[in-house]
Amino acid sequence: DLALTLVTLAVGATMVLTYFVPYVDPGSVWFFPVLGLAAPAVYVASVVLMLYWIIRWRWVCAGAMLVVVVAGVFKVSLFWRPEIRRSYATETAFDRAAVKVMSYNVRSFYGEDGRSSVDDILRLIEEQAPDLICLQEFNARLAEQSEEFSLLGEKYEIAHFGRTQAPDSVYGSTLTILSKYRILRSDTVLTPSSSVWADVIVGEDTVRVFNNHLRSTAINASDNQFITSHQFLSDTARETKIRSIVTRLRENSVLRAAQVDSIAQVVGATRTRRIVCGDFNDTPVS
């Protein structure tokens, strides 16, 4: 039991640390962003160890893990939110004054197979008929070639922003806000590809709509294959791969935190009603 006791201590300590992830600047403690990714697995491990010690009647270890597990109960919904009694047979009825908002990273209108998905996505928007739309990685060139987009433009006012000039931007994507309400003005918070806003008139109110696309984790297809399939690599190659992934997670978490600070200042200083949308590229525990 000594080995499992040590494992329990390690898992319990790690679980406690995950509770502090949202409150610690990624730039000050480098491993906290990685803990955020591991939080669901650590929580499951904590539950398993708690049950093990209960079965063994080791109440000190069981009690310690029970405290850790109970402390995390309210965070479980961040990862898993079962809707056992929800029915999809009927649509939810909304108040007539409700505003329907859609936020969608359209990935430059390219699907997983590399083919254009612009018409499919625009048809989905047409079917859902949202009042406000925030699109990330919007490819203006492909959109403007689509007849569906022309039809969409007849129903929505569109706030266009400049194209991304980043060297890794293959398709020149940017952020776009579409509104069935009149757009008064629009501007950028950081860059046209990371954070923008538009003021729209909803009834008698001015509402500022923020559209954000924060720094990604930079985890690519090769990294996903390595993580999910336990791809066989030599010890040296495995160490290099893990070091590369962790380094990118850390560096991009720091950059993302700086973006959040800048955006939060602008959102906080906004005197009108606000709607904040976007692809935030982070874990629920962040």
Question: Across the structure, where does each feature detected by a protein language model lie?
Answer:
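Transmembrane alpha-helices and immediately adjacent membrane-cytoplasm interface residues
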Residues: Y43-Y88
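Membrane-anchoring hydrophobic segments
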Residues: D1-A3
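Active-site surface patch of divalent metal-dependent phosphodiester/phosphate bond hydrolases
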Residues: P26, F32-V44, V67-G72, Y88-K100, ...
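Membrane-embedded alpha-helical segments of integral membrane proteins
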Residues: L6-W57
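Active-site beta-strand/loop signature of hydrolases that rely on acidic residues for catalysis
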Residues: A98-V106, I121-S146, G162, A198, ...
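Active-site catalytic loop in hydrolytic enzyme cores
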Residues: T191-A237
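The feature marks either
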Residues: Y88-A93, E126, Y181-I183, G203-D205, ...
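Acidic/histidine-rich helix-loop elements
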Residues: P33, A98, S103-V118, A140-L142, ...
